[in-house]
């Protein structure tokens, strides 16, 4: 029996997340991301998007609102924030992953 690529990816992702959590890096990266998003005004913008989306619906639905807001929210993250967080994640991965 062979394991599919998706199963391998999911397993690898779970192992990396476990290492991140156990090392304390998950919390550190998460805290830095939260600080940057707050400083950039991202949270306020996403709240505004959510209020607008919900006010347009007769019967607001979380899943539908999320599907509408999420792409916009991701686009609102400043590139400098994305780059800084990716550098942290990359540095962590370079510490734990053996390369040949």
Swiss-Prot record:
The keyword ATP-binding does not apply. It is found in: Nucleus, Nucleoplasm; Cytoplasm, P-body. GO terms for molecular function: chromatin binding; enzyme activator activity; transcription coactivator activity. InterPro entries: TF_ENY2 (IPR018783), TF_EnY2_sf (IPR038212). One of its GO terms (biological process) is transcription elongation by RNA polymerase II. GO terms for cellular component: DUBm complex; nuclear pore; nucleoplasm; P-body; SAGA complex; SLIK (SAGA-like) complex; transcription export complex 2. Gene3D superfamilies: 1.10.246.140. Its main location: nucleus. Keywords: Activator, Chromatin regulator, Cytoplasm, mRNA transport, Nucleus, Protein transport, Transcription, Transcription regulation, Translocation, Transport. Involved in mRNA export coupled transcription activation by association with both the TREX-2 and the SAGA complexes. At the promoters, SAGA is required for recruitment of the basal transcription machinery. It influences RNA polymerase II transcriptional activity through different activities such as TBP interaction and promoter selectivity, interaction with transcription activators, and chromatin modification through histone acetylation and deubiquitination. Belongs to the ENY2 family. Component of the nuclear pore complex (NPC)-associated TREX-2 complex (transcription and export complex 2), composed of at least SUS1, SAC3, THP1, SEM1, and CDC31. TREX-2 contains 2 SUS1 chains. The TREX-2 complex interacts with the nucleoporin NUP1. Component of the 1.8 MDa SAGA transcription coactivator-HAT complex. SAGA is built of 5 distinct domains with specialized functions. Within the SAGA complex, SUS1, SGF11, SGF73 and UBP8 form an additional subcomplex of SAGA called the DUB module (deubiquitination module). Interacts directly with THP1, SAC3, SGF11, and with the RNA polymerase II. This is Transcription and mRNA export factor SUS1.
